[in-house]
Amino acid sequence: MGPTDQDWIGCAVSIACDEVLGVFQGLIKQISAEEITIVRAFRNGVPLRKQNAEVVLKCTDIRSIDLIEPAKQDLDGHTAPPPVVNKPTPVKLPHFSNILGKQQQLQLQQQQQQLQLQQQQKQQFQEQEREQDLPSTPRSRANDNGRVAAGGASSSSGPRGNFNSALSDKMHQLKLIETNGSNGTLRTPQTSRASSAQQQPQISTTPNSVAAFFGNMIPPKVEVKLGSYVSNTRESYCSSSGDSGEATGLSLGSSKPIDIVSNGDGFYKQTAASSYGNTNGNVRRNGNANNNGNGTGNGSYTNGNGNGNGKNKRNRVRRESSMRQQQVQLTFGSEADDPLIHEDFDFEGNLALFDKQAIWDDIESTTQKPDVVRHIVNNHHHKPEQKYRHDENILASKPLQLRQIESMFGGSQDFVTDDGLIIPTIPAYVRNKIEISADKAGLSLQRQIDILARGASDLAITLLGGARRLTPANNHQWPKIAIICDGGKNMRTINIGAATGRQLASHGLTVLLYVEQAKLLEQNSSSPEISLFKATDNVIVHSVDALPTPDLVILSTNTANLSDAIRKWLSVNRASVLAIDPPPCGINEVAIKYSILPILPLNGISTATTSSSSSAAATPTPIASTSAAASATKSAASTNNCGKLYLCNLGIPDKFYRDCGIKYKSPYGHKYVIPIHSKD
């Protein structure tokens, strides 16, 4: 009885196809009259990416099939020297993105050389067999005749009854695997292929599929099926618990060539090419091997039962290897025929998007102009985008009532705040009437003076630099302030000046109070404000010569004409002048820079020149240098005005405004002192 299809399963074959497919080598898994299925395949000497992949070749594409002979024994039972077997040379896996081109040409040349060498070796081997007159076997007869049919039937001659028995005897004679009881490893005594493969393992990063490995090299005629040897028992050619190290090595993509040795079932198994070892790359498999393949031992990295530490380590190594492969695939996984590589960059289209003429016009329009003009031009062309404030309502609301204060008296002049609210002026007698009405209701004149002095002191501290200058680290050069109370015929202006000096002294500033009318102080020695000012240990002087060089001068007077000595001293002095409730017409020959007013401004009040912007008047500028103050004094010496105006909130209720004929709503918001500007 001749050999059946099942007798060829497990045999190592070399299948030569047409020029397009090339030469395949592997183990026969399934064979029929129409097709043959091999596993652990090599194509043109290059191993497949996955060792558990199945390659199905149709008989119409196969030109010849050659059996790859294992090691054999002579008639005396001694192992003969192994013949030269045309096994695939270990080839380092190529970089798959560059697998086409010159590399393919080199592979084709290598394939042709291998085919020629294979034919020469086969002829030599056949001549040796004829000389020794060995009994023929199915494999030798197949080689003598030179070919095996594509359908799996043999074309050899001879008795078919002895063919199967001879094949079985030959398979049993080739069982050369010995079990080493001391360490549980598998060895082949007379071949050096397994040991050399263990000494030089080649482990490379592999793609996700066979198609990704070969790319365009596998034609569509070859069906590549990725078998799952874990779920399908029929496809598990590397089974049994004792072979867990081999399965692990195969799953990691070992590129070791096929070792052709047989077992009792007719399968050819590859010895472990790679296993988990120490950091220097040596292969370590310790333990005792038994018949069922289970291994035990101390310090074993891969054993049959799956030691807890070894199993966790293997799982961790698999996860890390999988993550590295995914990262490499994401980084370098672009195909060689990626259309983006061959797409040309449109330089002309990209250049057309750049408006060079507009850039040149902008450069030429500003390069030849002075810095001031260039700054104005840039601000004109590049206007900042108007944005909403964090507290501004973006929804439409009722129109803002800018005129919240309405006066029924004639001669009124309108001022505006920074928020655009209109502040009208009122006659002097109306303001006096409001003060008297509040005094009668309990808000005494002394309390009103104290609130006005508080607003004046806050404004003075801001003008002196505020937190930038009044710090403990700058205590050695704190400013000095001179308060001038001149020309007053009553104690009101003196009390305002004394209260302002007291509150400034409470901040640690040095204050000198100048009062020309010494007799007036003697007559009103019981004035509470004078007594409180003396308690601050500051000095009241009556001579201009006793005045130091101050950083700020505060005028508290209601007359437009000062004494000659004070005017001369002010003209020589370079300090800025802050006036508290000055006359509406200003002070003759005195350049007032700032003025603070109670309640509402009076009719006919004169402000600073129109050249000064409203934005600059909105925030008081600290006194930076005496030279700047001197230049400002000279420019404004010929004008009689009150400078920049500030309005102080005295806390008078709205009822007293209405009683005096003024429709009033507070314009102060969150401040006690607000700047006002001329509406014109």
Curated annotation (Swiss-Prot):
Region entry Required for P-body targeting and interaction with DCP1A, spans: 1-101
Occurrences of domain YjeF N-terminal (ranges): 430-658
MF annotations from Gene Ontology: mRNA binding
Effect upon mutating N44A: Strongly reduced interaction with DCP1A, but no effect on P-body targeting
Segments of this protein annotated with the region Required for interaction with DCP2: 102-338
GO biological process: deadenylation-independent decapping of nuclear-transcribed mRNA; mRNA catabolic process; P-body assembly
Flavoprotein recorded as keyword: no
Keyword Metal-binding attributed: no
Role description: In the process of mRNA degradation, may play a role in mRNA decapping.
Oligomeric form and interacting partners: Forms a complex with DCP1A, DCP2, Me31B/DDX6 and EDC4/HEDLS. Within this complex directly interacts with DCP1A, DCP2 and Me31B/DDX6. Homooligomer. Interacts with Gyf.
Name this polypeptide is given: Enhancer of mRNA-decapping protein 3
Source taxonomy: Eukaryota, Metazoa, Ecdysozoa, Arthropoda, Hexapoda
